Amino acid sequence: GSAGSGGSDGSGDASGTGQSVESSTEISGKVIDGYISGATVFLDLNFNGVKDVNEPSTVSVAEGDFNFGLTATELECASYVPLVVDVPVGAVDAEFGEVTEAYQMILPPMFEPISSSDILNISPITSLVWNTIETLSPTPIIELSCEAVIADQTKREATARLLENAIRDVVVHYNISEEKLFTDFIAEENTAVK
């Protein structure tokens, strides 16, 4: 009997921790120029391009792989905010070796739900799409935030339209098919070549 009561005390403690018990969904993807390890990937909740304290982040490993757990709120935000990669000096590009100059790559928000089965590829091509969104946007993107986009359907639709237009521009300008914009082009190239 006493073991049983001990067990219930234990579970009482667990629920007492509050936040950490909130279930999380793991999302994953790849950082690609060549595959880059040692880069910091974060969910840019306030669109400022800087990893803030409250923003979920992780570091990419071999083959550019990254994954992190998101709370339900963060997961919802992931559909509406960019995923940013800070590639620092000293990160390793599987194709070109050690990175000597820091740079950033960005995956624009897709405006559709993200699930743990999605692979989010962040590359110079996805960054082009994001840069195009910034260029096309009538107001500075920096004025957006996850809360603002979720709360404001007009803002959401306007930004989703910007994404569509940016994709179209990049497709036309660089002669890349739309489905190739967000893929792992290294893996595809390798299968195509070999």
Regions of interest found by a model, annotated:
Residues 1-194:
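Feature for extracytoplasmic/surface-facing segments of secreted or surface-associated proteins
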